[in-house]
Amino acid sequence: MGRAHEAAETMRRGGGIGYDFSRIRPRGDTIKSLDSQSSGPVSFMGIYDAVCQTIASSGHRRGAQMGCMRVDHPDIREFIRAKRNSDRLTGFNVSVGVTDKFMDALKTESGEFDLVFEDKVYETINAHELWDEIMESTWDWAEPGVLFIDRINEMNNLYYCCLLYTSPSPRDS
């Protein structure tokens, strides 16, 4: 809960926060040390959303959060659909981190693309179908955004700091 406390303090002071949820185990993945299963990244987003809804930052503006997930994460479809219910994750903007590998898969007829976590392939999907789902969701719900993450990191002057994503608000960038 230390990160949630840090997030609350940042938002209380008027700041915005970006999170990369790609490093959280996919839903249903085994957690050996606990002999349990992961609830997945989207469930963790709910915790941070509750913090954001609770904190009114400097004045009446609520905190701003951006949740990102790599396009190759096994829970990417759940992430894309997470905000279709207007009552869910209202303290978040969400964006998909699109990789060069995904864009290359879109250029092929088969569109084969692997969803992976910690070098384990969970599923091979059709990149064309996933791209269509991203675009339809963006058209219908105005989310997710698309971040060409490899290009961003390639052009990043602070590449050695491993910066992955940016702030949800242009003035906080």
Language-model segments: residues:
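Conserved, charged catalytic cores of large soluble enzymes
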Residues: 24, 33-47, 57-160
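Conserved small/polar residues in nucleotide/adenosyl-binding loops
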Residues: 165-170
